[in-house]
Amino acid sequence: MPYQQITVNVNDAVAERLADALMEHGALSAAIEDACAGTQNEQAIFGEPGMPTEQIWQQSKVIALFGEHDEAAAVIDAAAQECGLKDLAYTGETIENQDWVRLTQSQFDPIRISDRLWITPSWHEAPEGCAVNLRLDPGLAFGTGSHPTTRLCLKWLDTQLKNGESVLDYGCGSGILTIAALKLGAGSAVGVDIDEQAVRSGRDNAEQNNVDAQFFLPDSLPQGQFDVVVANILANPLRMLGEMLAARTKQGGRIVLSGLLDEQAEELGGIYSQWFDLDPAETDEGWARLSGVKR
């Protein structure tokens, strides 16, 4: 069954209201994208909980999907009227039904982290049979290895982790770093996340990779310290969790922090230098990683 896809260009003041109104009046879905994406006017936005940052592009486009026989024009008129918009211009096209699973799978290829470390979706053959291959499929939890912060943490584990060390992955998402630590020689690895879906995803991914990783919600994490603590989260949580993460790190143990932007590294380094001797920040595409040894 084909679908009708409608695109409306609007400004940031009404984009969210229009998307909500389209859904209320019968659209199957409504998404907001940067109307200038792919041009020199593309606007990069990084959202972070608790931080005052603009979340909608100044020039946005609302993309709505309708069934083949839905009265899309009537829905658009009703939504526009609700938002106080007159003579709302839009474009439409027909989207043929597809094997969406196969289409999605085709968009995810194996990711090379280093000569010996790859992230490989389950439907792909391992590109390097002798390498460490993390079997990971895109899902609801963050962390497929494509993001610079995940790569930065994986590269640290690949080059710095020592055999037999214990690892805490705080803010584990999909469990990719927890699983990688075990495959790279950790003696034990524990993942923690505030999202129950992430905990379930981590357990499923660990089973797929045949590793004995443990995953917990924060309140369920057993007491104890670790040789290595990794936290690939955002700057604001890192600010608040510093004392706790330091307490979870053994004396002489090491910490790895990412999820922060280049310009946030100096500030975060100042906070964590209370407990750690930090190395210079490593960066990748505007994102940074801090690491160091607990005094």
UniProtKB/Swiss-Prot annotation:
Residues bound to S-adenosyl-L-methionine: 150, 171, 193, 232
Pfam families: PrmA
Enzyme class: transferase
GO BP of this protein: methylation
Entry-linked CDD domains: AdoMet_MTases (cd02440)
Lineage: superkingdom: Bacteria
Chain's role: Methylates ribosomal protein L11.
HAMAP family: Methyltr_PrmA (MF_00735)
Name the record gives this protein: Ribosomal protein L11 methyltransferase
Source organism per UniProt: Neisseria gonorrhoeae (strain ATCC 700825 / FA 1090)
The encoding gene: prmA
